[in-house]
Design a protein with these regions (language model features):
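Anionic-ligand binding region
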Residues: 235-237
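Structural scaffold positions in well-ordered secondary structure
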Residues: 24, 145, 180-182, 207, ...
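PLP-dependent aminotransferase-like
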Residues: 89-147
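Conserved small/polar residues in nucleotide/adenosyl-binding loops
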Residues: 249-256
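Short loop-beta-helix segment that forms the pyridoxal 5′-phosphate
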Residues: 52, 64-86
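Active-site PLP attachment segment
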Residues: 200-233, 246-247
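Active-site pre-lysine segment of PLP-dependent enzymes
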Residues: 128-141, 153-177, 181-213
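N-terminal "arm"/small-domain region of PLP-dependent enzymes with the aminotransferase-like
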Residues: 1-50
Length: 256
């Protein structure tokens, strides 16, 4: 039987124990699906007889306004996990560096591509914070680095100055830096904390998702920000053409 490493497997729990669980593993907003999104999905049912836009043009246009980045720097996917796998398959890293502990999906994706995964263990004496030691662990053999902001499961936020220093180290070593900001919007002043101001670097990829903050894990919608158009093109080609349902690509922007 296939074993899942990600949380939120309520169906598996129900099948095994005959009841629902109080699930603290998925960290999804308890407030439910926003009313505007529910209405947009209902309205979009009228288009269900047509294939969705494979480039998510309408959704990317709204996200571009929300994120204040060019639409061509945005790629939408079937949740952030879809984009993690697409990135790994597109970039084909040989060696990757992760903080430990961190979100298990990074290593799961990397291993499907035959990538060697190195973990830099975070220290309890430092409150499991990412420090300069993690930056120093990036070397010439490192092709990809993942950083979860804030980290899952420790909850620690890496200061933006340290993220910038990590990016510079990755640039010097020829590595891609993947900053996962799927939880960042739960924090006050998330816009100030975001690595978006560093997006001029072609080595930076930022992951975002509607899953957590907007209580729509079952809907599956994520996106990434990156100024490296060639890399985004490879990621687009690394997955199926219609990753985002027609029920979603015209949904309201996060501001709605």
């Amino acid at each position: 039987m296939m074993q899942l490493v990600h949380g939120g497997d309520w169906a598996g729990y129900r099948a095994q124990y005959g009841q629902d669980a109080l699930d603290f593993s998925a960290n999804v907003s308890p407030l439910g699906l926003p009313e505007g999104v529910a209405k947009a999905i209902t309205a979009a049912l009228a288009t269900a007889d047509r294939y969705p836009d494979p480039l998510c043009r309408a959704l990317r246009a709204k996200l571009a306004v929300h994120e204040t980045v060019p639409a061509e720097h945005i790629l939408c996917g079937n949740g952030a996990a879809d984009l993690i796998f697409r990135l790994v398959w597109a970039a084909k890293p040989r060696t990757a560096l992760l903080p430990a502990p961190t979100f298990a999906e990074y290593a799961a994706a990397l291993e499907t591509a035959g990538c060697t995964v190195r973990g830099q263990f975070l220290r309890e004496i430092e409150d499991f914070a990412v420090t300069e030691a993690f930056i120093s662990a990036v070397d010439e053999d490192t092709d990809m680095v993942f950083l979860c902001q804030p980290n899952n499961p420790t909850g620690q936020l890496t200061p933006l100055a340290l993220v910038e220093a990590l990016l510079h180290r990755c640039e010097a070593c020829g590595a891609l830096l993947v900053v996962d900001e799927c939880f960042l919007d739960f924090l006050p002043q998330s816009e100030v904390l975001s690595a978006k101001k560093l997006l001029a670097s072609p080595n930076l990829i930022i992951l975002k998702a509607f899953t957590k903050l907007y209580g729509m894990a079952g809907v599956r919608l994520g996106y990434c920000l990156c100024s490296n158009i060639a890399l985004l093109d490879k990621m687009q080609a690394a997955g199926q053409p219609w990753a985002v349902s027609c029920l979603l690509y015209t949904s309201p922007s996060p501001r709605d």
